[in-house]
Amino acid sequence: MLDPIVKTIEVPCSQEKAFNVFVNEMDSWWPLGKFTVSAMGGAPAKAIRVDAKQGGKIVEIGPSGTEYLWGTIKSYDPHDFFSMDFHFAPPGEKVDARTLVEVRFTALGNKRTRVVLTQSNWEAFGEKAAMLRDRGYGQAWVAIFEGAYKAACGG
């Protein structure tokens, strides 16, 4: 069993804002020109659409309007917790497995929040699991979560 990726940051904003930025403003901070299906195909994505509710979909909108399903929201507890099944593959490759991404938001005061992102279920990828975890997502979350998301929260 492969250990999950766990990333912990503190952001200088309220718990409510930290949650809303992560879920409802995702396409304002996610690096659309680097960490998207479209970017793997050579062009930045236009947008990310999040249907913010349990069972809602997270969808990338490509430059030509093509939609790529990133995952489905499994748990949705506004301001506290958000989880989704998650994976996207290069253009033309079938997505046959998904990880579980869980994000927990804990208030540390009026203007400070701890945000913990955990990505698990690597076993679903079989032989590719360690490579995806260590060289793919493990490195990407540094730029996406610790960099872009934290900056969007004012950090």
Question: Predicted regions span which residues?
Answer:
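Short, highly charged C-terminal tails/helix-capping segments
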Residues: 39-46, 150-155
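Hydrophobic pocket/interface hotspot
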Residues: 18-22, 58, 73, 84, ...
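Hydrophobic-ligand binding "helix-grip"
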Residues: 49, 54, 59-112, 120
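Glycine-centered loop/turn positions within well-structured domains
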Residues: 16, 80, 147
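Alpha-helical scaffold segments that form or flank carboxylate-/histidine-based iron centers
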Residues: 6, 45, 101, 132-136
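Short, contiguous alpha-helical
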Residues: 34, 107, 116, 145-152
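A conserved amphipathic terminal alpha-helix motif
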Residues: 120-155
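Hydrophobic ligand-binding cavity/cleft-lining segments
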Residues: 1-44
